[in-house]
Each structure stands twice: as structure tokens, then as C-alpha cells.
From Swiss-Prot:
This is Large ribosomal subunit protein bL27. Keywords: Ribonucleoprotein, Ribosomal protein. It comes from Alcanivorax borkumensis (strain ATCC 700651 / DSM 11573 / NCIMB 13689 / SK2). It comes from the Bacteria. Residues 1-24 are annotated as: Disordered. GO terms for molecular function: structural constituent of ribosome. Belongs to the bacterial ribosomal protein bL27 family. SUPFAM superfamilies: Ribosomal L27 protein-like (SSF110324). The keyword GTP-binding does not apply. Pfam families: Ribosomal_L27 (PF01016). The gene is rpmA. One of its GO terms (cellular component) is cytosolic large ribosomal subunit.
Amino acid sequence: MAHKKAGGSTRNGRDSESKRLGVKRYGGQVVSAGEIIVRQRGTKFHAGVNAGMGKDHTIFAKETGRVKFEVKGPLNRKYVVIEPVA
């Protein structure tokens, strides 16, 4: 009778679900208060004027306005600023 040896097992075959990180609203776009601008791990972007940071480092708008990305300070940090719409 024909026999076939058992195939080996593997310890691979798993992957985590993607977290959908990144910039959600770009420079020049108008956002309303509470809207998420950037989802990130760590502080790639910092919260500037009229922007807040959640406990998972999400940057969100505190006021309705136009999104602006700025680089400033001695460490050349990237800030997200919301300029009020007149």
C-alpha cells in the first residue's frame, strides 16, 4: 500500500490587523472642532495652536479652521496648527 509521511507543521501564518495610521486631513483643508487630523504612534507631529493631542497621540482640532503644518523650534519639530477661518 502507498504511504505518505505526515507533513511538517509551521509556526507562521499570523499577522495583526492594520491600524490605519497617518494624516487624515492635509494642509489647507478646513476642519471642524473634534475632527481627527493625524493618527500616529508616538509624536511624529506635535499639537500646535487650536490642536489637541489624545492619549494615543492622535492630533485633533479644538476649533473650526484651516489645517497648517509647521516646522519650528531648535529640534525642527513638526506642529499641526489650526488657523481660524474668518
